Regions:
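Edge beta-strand plus adjacent loop/short-helix module at the start
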Residues: 1, 6-7, 87-276, 286
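Outer-membrane beta-barrel "beta-signal"
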Residues: 446, 514, 533-544
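Histidine- and aromatic-rich segments of cupredoxin/plastocyanin-like copper-binding domains
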Residues: 1-124, 293-304
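Transmembrane beta-strand segments of Gram-negative outer membrane beta-barrel proteins
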Residues: 234, 363-382, 388-399, 494, ...
């Protein structure tokens, strides 16, 4: 029987395994490939694979899918009788993966939200983050999009320090090298760019089983060498803290269309600078996924880009029906909605059928405001925090009231300059006299907030009475359901606006608190804390 498997999930990719003999993989994304016996196969979101499965006269074959993170499995059975079990894919060794990563020379933290989104820093970003190729001094990074179909030049003497696995240095293995983005002068007959997708450097095999080298097209898929090539580098970037996803540090809402035309080959290099897989899908097209099969690289409509890896695709819009705008996105739903998408636009009039569906509506879907909050109800204090935010803009409202009638409330607006830094302004209200609600002081505040290394939340501000204040807070998850937190705040009044007490050069105020929280469920926690304004106590925290 022919079994077609489609990953229709929103956020989960799977490993597929079969009981009995190895099935024959015959199609990928609906297009034929050279048949190959393959049992354990990875399927990304939106991908499709067809297998020829031979059902025995006696016994039933288990077809088993395992979530990529090992969190769950499901099975279907083909045939009757005793079960022929499918191989079990073990859970990933997360500790082992982290140990391997610790040995790699790579810099994490590429911005998902750049300070200057219109500035082209693609190649600088690629060079700075991810796997550090310090010894590849001959790499030539051109900040313009390349339209040259010839192989650029590279000084071979600069590759003396490159560390490779021993078998990859042999001359007869050179066809497996992946030099995407490197400029290398080699005779065209000796090495074609399309055949260099398989090179693995020392320490880069952490995700080596995620590749498409087993897929080979039955016919040649390469394009005429005289057709010009436009090369586009897309660094895949993301921020798990705020869940912003983008390309080249620019989410869809701040990006220009990718302009292409049907008179040239469009070559897109995906460079994944995140620790998540990204199944990239281009509407309305099949593209070549460059692998070790060179001219016979397969055609697909979705390609999975593993963490810290690079994948190259090509397409040539010369069929006559490629025109207008096409959506191009990560098929993990939450990544797409977080901004990891683009609009690919041919230099043709827009499809008249789309006039009632402006692109701006699509873009707005990826830049919605989301609102959430938390209420603390405890024996010594009551607090409320509400946040409403889209990609760049955020509104905050906070309120604290203690059993001893100490009250403070604040409303601010902040703007994210990049992932970790934002500027803000707002209004702060607090009672002037402790243990009395008769009089309140209202001040205007401006400042910056910064998420420091090691995830400390820094707040530096000054109010309209020219009193500077600095605050620093941190929450640490010690166990799956248990966290501790702390906050320190110091404000000083130098008497620039206010009159100081006699014989005082300044006055100051210190606020600090510390506590712990146990998560009963996703939305409710037990908490206990001590605050130098309110004292100690305990209660419930409710998230909404």
């Amino acid at each position: 029987v022919r079994l077609r498997i489609i990953d229709g999930g929103a956020s989960t990719s799977f490993w597929m395994t079969f009981g009995g003999g190895d099935p024959v993989l015959v199609s990928a994304d609906g297009l034929d490939v050279v048949p190959v016996e393959k049992n354990k196969t990875f399927i990304g979101i939106a991908e499709t694979y067809d297998f020829i499965v031979t059902i025995p006269e006696e016994g039933k074959i288990e077809f088993r899918i395992t979530a990529q993170d090992g969190s769950g499995t499901a099975s279907a059975f083909l045939g009757n009788g005793n079960m022929l079990p499918a191989p079990i894919v073990p859970r990933p060794d997360k500790i082992g993966m982290m140990q391997k990563m610790a040995k790699m020379d790579m810099k994490m933290g590429a911005h998902a939200l750049k300070y200057r989104p219109k500035k082209d820093e693609r190649y600088k970003m690629k060079e700075e983050y991810g796997m550090q190729m310090d010894k590849m001094q001959g790499m030539n990074m051109d900040n313009s999009e390349k339209k040259d179909d010839a192989m650029p030049k590279m000084d071979h003497t600069k590759m003396q320090g490159m560390e490779m696995k021993k078998d990859s240095t042999q001359h007869d293995k050179m066809q497996d090298m992946n030099m995407d983005g490197m400029n290398m002068a080699m005779p065209k007959d000796t090495m074609k760019m399309e055949t260099m997708a398989g090179m693995k450097l020392q320490g880069m095999d952490l995700f080596s089983e995620y590749n498409y080298d087993y897929l080979k097209s039955p016919q040649k898929t390469n394009y005429d060498k005289d057709v010009p090539v436009k090369e586009i580098l897309l660094n895949l970037t993301g921020n798990m803290n705020r869940y912003i996803w983008s390309m080249n540090g620019v989410p869809l809402s701040e990006a220009d269309k990718i302009k292409i035309n049907n008179r040239e080959v469009t070559r897109i290099i995906f460079n994944n600078l995140t620790m998540m897989h990204h199944p990239m899908h281009l509407h309305g097209h099949f593209f070549r996924v460059i692998n070790e099969n060179g001219d016979y690289s397969p055609l697909k409509h979705t390609v999975n880009v593993p963490p810290m890896q690079q994948v190259t695709i090509e397409f040539y819009g010369n069929e006559g029906d490629e025109y207008g705008d096409w959506f191009f996105h990560c098929h993990i739903l939450y990544h797409m909605m977080g901004g990891m998408a683009r609009v690919v636009s041919y230099d043709t009039p827009r499809d008249p059928r789309m006039y009632g569906y402006p692109v701006s509506n699509l873009v707005a879907e990826t830049n919605k405001y989301y609102t959430w909050g938390m209420v603390d109800v405890a024996s010594h204090t009551t607090a409320l925090n509400v946040i409403s935010s889209n990609i760049r803009n955020q509104f905050n409202v906070s309120f604290e009231y203690g059993w001893n009638k100490n009250l403070e409330a604040e409303a601010t607006y902040e703007y994210y300059l990049h992932d970790y830094l934002r500027v803000f302004g707002g209004v702060n209200i607090e009672n002037e006299t402790r243990k009395s609600l008769d009089q309140f002081k209202t001040t205007a505040v401006v400042g910056v907030r910064y998420l420091t290394p090691y995830l400390f939340a820094l707040d530096a501000r000054i109010d309209n009475e020219l009193r500077p204040r600095i605050g620093l807070g941190r929450s640490i998850m010690l166990f799956p359901r248990f966290s501790v937190f702390g906050y320190y705040e110091y404000q000083i009044d130098l008497g620039i606006v206010n009159n100081l007490p006699v014989n005082k050069d300044f006055t100051s105020e210190t606020v600090w608190s510390a506590g712990a929280e146990y998560f009963l469920s996703r939305n409710i926690s037990l908490m206990g804390s001590y605050d130098n304004r309110f004292g100690g106590g305990g209660g419930l925290s409710v998230r909404f």
